[in-house]
């Protein structure tokens, strides 16, 4: 016989699962009919409410629990059939999937995006292949691009190979043609995950020079650590990129996004940092790394952020071949 505490815990677990299942059915990516999605989501929500009420009614309790269990199992079976795919009609900027070839001394990235943008939606497409010597990896930069105040940002990294140049890696939503992003639908398997490997003139300049409707403010921070730590981080990224080629993944607004994917990869590094709520709110990721001693601590964070603001320098550099050097030029 369940105690009062046991009933409370059972009710909370059912509430959590039932709320997710109801919302998932309301936003089911494989059910085109809005009316059917509403019917299924509403029915599950009604069953959840009935089950929770029945917890206080001994005569109805276990019958309601059995019905809820059957519905939950049916939902899980149906939800497991929603699988990510590499075979869709993708937007041009995520049409190709990056992959990496690793040897003892080099790393080669295939399908490196190097678009020349005229506007956010107009560009000359170019996809490259780039090879770098691992012994020339000098460090890693973190870019944080803000467009809705301090809390909301897109975070990506760039690996510095010195005279060989730099390569940026950005974890993004792989949108289909005509598809728009929604943070709510991003919780329910609507979008695949994309690892965009790109030239900085592509991924930085797009945000600083062309996105004007919601202007983005882009900041660059140099991560502390040894070249060996940077190499661990790079190789972890490369393995994850290759794994996504073999087995596509879903993007998730909370669990598999630009910020916590970077943290997961960094956790493989001997110099990893502990998880924090600030990594869930992407705009505070850089500040958290500063607090953990992973950014230059010789100046206050506000000053480091001011010095790292790259918009004006990126706009001045524009298409220049030395774009990356110019966005890093001291004031």
Protein language model annotation of sequence segments:
Residues 83-103:
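Alpha-helical transmembrane signal-anchor/signal-peptide segments
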Residues 102-106, 160-164, 225-230:
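A short, structured loop/turn motif at beta-sheet edges
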Residues 92, 149-151, 262:
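Short, glycine/acidic-rich beta->alpha junctions
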Residues 100, 112-120, 268-273:
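Short amphipathic alpha-helical segments with coiled-coil-like heptad repeat character
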Residues 107, 112, 118-215:
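Glycine-rich catalytic cores of cysteine/serine-nucleophile enzymes that process amide/ester linkages
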Residues 47-85:
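Transmembrane alpha-helices and immediately adjacent membrane-cytoplasm interface residues
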Residues 188-268, 274:
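Soluble catalytic domains of enzymes that build or remodel membrane lipids, polysaccharides, and related
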Residues 2-50, 238-331:
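Activation targets extended, charge/polar-rich intrinsically disordered C-terminal tails
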């Amino acid at each position: 016989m369940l105690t009062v505490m046991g009933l409370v815990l059972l009710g909370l677990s059912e509430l959590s699962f039932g709320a997710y299942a109801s919302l998932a059915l309301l936003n089911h990516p494989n059910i085109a009919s809005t009316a059917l999605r509403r019917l299924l989501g509403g029915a599950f929500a009604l069953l959840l409410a009935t089950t929770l009420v029945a917890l206080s009614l001994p005569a109805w309790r276990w019958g309601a629990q059995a019905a809820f269990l059957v519905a939950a199992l049916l939902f899980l079976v149906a939800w497991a059939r929603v699988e990510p795919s590499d075979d869709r009609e993708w937007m041009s900027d995520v049409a190709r999937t990056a992959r990496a070839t690793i040897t003892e001394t080099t790393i080669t990235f295939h399908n490196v995006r190097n678009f020349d943008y005229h506007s956010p939606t107009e560009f000359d497409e170019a996809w490259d292949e780039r090879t770098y010597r691992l012994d020339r990896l000098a460090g890693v930069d973190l870019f944080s691009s803000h467009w809705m105040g301090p809390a909301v940002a897109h975070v990506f990294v760039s690996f510095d190979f010195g005279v060989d140049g730099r390569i940026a890696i950005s974890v993004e939503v792989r949108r289909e043609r005509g598809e728009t992003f929604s943070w709510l639908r991003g919780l329910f398997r609507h979008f695949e995950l994309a690892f965009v490997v790109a030239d900085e003139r592509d991924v930085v300049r797009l945000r600083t020079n062309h996105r004007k409707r919601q202007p983005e403010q882009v900041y660059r921070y140099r991560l502390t650590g040894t070249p060996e730590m940077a190499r661990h981080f790079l190789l972890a990224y490369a393995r994850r990129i290759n794994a996504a080629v073999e087995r596509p993944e879903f993007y998730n607004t909370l669990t598999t996004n630009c910020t916590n994917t970077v943290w997961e990869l960094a956790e493989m590094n001997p110099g990893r940092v502990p998880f924090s709520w600030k990594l869930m709110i992407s705009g505070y990721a850089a500040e958290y790394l500063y607090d953990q001693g992973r950014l230059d601590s010789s100046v206050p964070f506000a000053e480091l952020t001011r010095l790292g603001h790259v918009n004006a320098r990126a706009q001045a550099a524009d298409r220049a071949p030395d774009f990356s050097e110019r966005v890093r030029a001291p004031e």
